[in-house]
């Protein structure tokens, strides 16, 4: 029998380990459509918790929700040249509006559309079209809108949650009277994402600006939060874009200023997706399955009653129901502790391993002997599966929120220590090549490099399969020359292999 619940382990085959964690935790599965996944109830419950927190944070910063069409006229994308060029290869196109029988029991497309429709890869163009109708005067500004929806981008190499053809996300779109307001909005939402990643996902991130070659198509500036996974590859976890007046001009978003002058507006967009669940898995999970930070866990505590006969069953169930009630009366991060009693007709060990693989933070086993002593037997997901301890029942209830927060903080600190130990300052091309030359499936972490725009697109990057992740916002002065061009460096840039 394997020593761990997941095979292969992280050290044996990290990409396959990742897929097996998703299967073992019963989070998602592949669908009949290539590149599209089924998000199962446990995985979707994590997404719902993410949605709930983010939605509140958006509303606390003045945003409201709306919904815009899935289908976008091709001509809308063509209005913004850089935008359409950036997404052209990923677009799914609808060309017909009905089906008909071919006489042999098969269905074929019929009724060709006058203009092809694009299944949204992102919604700047169609939302911009609507904003142009909504904005007449400076009094109509700002517009601060978010939508929760699905998007479609054909992907050749798919991986559940991390990179799928269809995925769920939120996209925020805002319109402002001045560049300054739009830039402030862009950074405000970057900070919202950073706060969410660190305080709820327990995933440390680096806030930064993308280099020009990595910007969102059509953006003036793209800001990002970058995380480092356990295999030392980077993950772009969220982006916020200052679009300048590019999309406003393409969509004719104009307003009459207080001085009576017609002006083009300034816009932003920002988004995160179900890719965050992939980041959550790869930041915290271990060789026994998913590890989910308590603040996002669908369940905080699972109670497993242990008994040998009907008489013991009745007594233990009464005891654990009272325990469940007392635990639910405790408040953790603004809501009741989420508790479940698992009374299925299964061995206790089987149940425990299911919840270990699903990442439930706290497992509680209660049998007649525990009940007689007024105790509970507690296991924590951030420790080994055999590390369990008896606790006095009332003390456990009183301490549950502290225990959950201790686990949350511990997961963050562990991930931060790993990240911080995996950033290396490199000031010459030879050391850079050596740092990243371990092969396609090995990554050392972040390389912090002196850089200038003349060094963009260096041929060595493609050979090493390394990309610039960001120019960190927290920059110390850079000295010396860009390692790629030899010209004076202007910024420190983080490079890494990435997802």
Swiss-Prot record:
Keyword rRNA-binding on entry: no
GO cellular component terms, semicolon-separated: aminoacyl-tRNA synthetase multienzyme complex; cytoplasm
Keyword entries, A-Z: Aminoacyl-tRNA synthetase, ATP-binding, Cytoplasm, Ligase, Nucleotide-binding, Protein biosynthesis
InterPro entries: aa-tRNA-synt_IIb, aa-tRNA-synth_II, aa-tRNA-synth_II/BPL/LPL, Anticodon-bd, Anticodon-bd_dom_sf, Pro-tRNA-ligase_IIa_arc-type, Pro-tRNA_ligase_II_C, Pro-tRNA_synth_II
Subcellular location: Cytoplasm
Known catalytic reactions: tRNA(Pro) + L-proline + ATP = L-prolyl-tRNA(Pro) + AMP + diphosphate
Pfam families: HGTP_anticodon, ProRS-C_1, tRNA-synt_2b
Entry-linked Gene3D superfamilies: Anticodon-binding domain, Bira Bifunctional Protein, Domain 2, C-terminal domain of ProRS
GO-annotated molecular function: ATP binding; proline-tRNA ligase activity
GO biological process, one term: prolyl-tRNA aminoacylation
UniProt record similarity statement: Belongs to the class-II aminoacyl-tRNA synthetase family. ProS type 3 subfamily.
Assembly notes: Homodimer.
Role summary: Catalyzes the attachment of proline to tRNA(Pro) in a two-step reaction: proline is first activated by ATP to form Pro-AMP and then transferred to the acceptor end of tRNA(Pro).
Domain comment quoted from the record: Consists of three domains: the N-terminal catalytic domain, the anticodon-binding domain and the C-terminal extension.
Name recorded for this polypeptide: Proline--tRNA ligase
Native source organism of the sequence: Bdellovibrio bacteriovorus (strain ATCC 15356 / DSM 50701 / NCIMB 9529 / HD100)
Protein encoded by which gene: proS
């Amino acid at each position: 029998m394997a020593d761990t619940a997941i095979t292969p382990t992280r050290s044996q085959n990290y990409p396959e380990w990742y897929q097996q964690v998703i299967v073992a935790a019963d989070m998602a599965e592949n669908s009949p459509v290539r590149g599209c996944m089924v998000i199962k109830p446990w995985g979707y419950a994590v997404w719902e918790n993410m949605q709930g927190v983010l939605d509140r944070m958006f509303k606390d910063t003045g945003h409201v929700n709306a919904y815009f069409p899935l289908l976008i006229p091709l001509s809308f994308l063509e209005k913004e040249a850089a935008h359409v060029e950036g997404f052209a290869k990923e677009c799914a196109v609808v060309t017909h509006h009905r089906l008909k029988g071919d006489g042999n029991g098969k269905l074929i497309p019929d009724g060709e559309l006058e203009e092809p429709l694009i299944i949204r890869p992102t919604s700047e163009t169609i939302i911009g079209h609507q904003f142009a109708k909504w904005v007449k005067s400076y009094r109509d500004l700002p517009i601060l809108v978010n939508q929760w929806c699905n998007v479609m981008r054909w992907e050749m190499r798919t991986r559940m949650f991390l990179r799928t053809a269809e995925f769920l996300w939120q996209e925020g779109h805002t319109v402002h009277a001045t560049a300054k307001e739009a830039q402030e909005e862009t950074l405000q939402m970057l900070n919202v994402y950073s706060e969410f990643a660190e305080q709820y996902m327990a995933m440390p991130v680096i806030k930064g600006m993308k280099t020009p070659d990595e910007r969102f198509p059509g953006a003036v500036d793209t800001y990002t939060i970058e995380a480092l996974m356990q295999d030392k590859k980077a993950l772009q976890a969220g982006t916020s874009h200052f679009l300048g007046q590019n999309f406003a001009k393409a969509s004719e978003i104009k307003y009459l200023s207080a001085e009576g002058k017609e002006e083009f507006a300034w816009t932003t967009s920002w988004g995160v997706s179900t890719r965050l669940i992939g980041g959550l898995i790869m930041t915290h999970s271990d060789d026994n399955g998913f590890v989910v930070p308590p603040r996002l866990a669908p369940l905080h505590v699972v109670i497993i009653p242990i008994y040998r006969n009907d008489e013991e069953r009745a007594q233990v169930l009464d005891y654990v129901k009272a325990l469940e009630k007392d635990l639910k009366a405790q408040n953790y991060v603004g809501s009741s502790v989420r508790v479940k009693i698992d009374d299925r007709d299964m061995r206790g060990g089987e149940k425990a391993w299911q919840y270990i693989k699903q990442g439930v933070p706290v497992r509680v086993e209660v049998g007649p002997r525990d009940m007689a002593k007024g105790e509970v037997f507690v296991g924590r997901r951030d420790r080994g599966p055999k590390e369990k301890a008896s606790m006095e029942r009332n003390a456990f209830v009183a301490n549950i929120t502290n225990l959950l927060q201790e686990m949350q903080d511990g997961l963050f600190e562990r991930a931060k220590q790993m990240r911080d130990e995996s950033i290396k300052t490199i000031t010459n091309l030879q050391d850079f090549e050596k740092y990243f030359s371990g092969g396609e499936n090995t990554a050392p972490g972040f390389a912090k490099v002196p850089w200038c725009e003349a060094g963009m697109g260096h041929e060595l990057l493609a050979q090493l399969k390394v990309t610039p992740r960001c120019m960190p916002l927290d920059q110390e002065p850079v000295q010396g020359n860009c390692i790629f061009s030899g010209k004076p460096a202007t910024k420190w840039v983080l490079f890494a292999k990435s997802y």
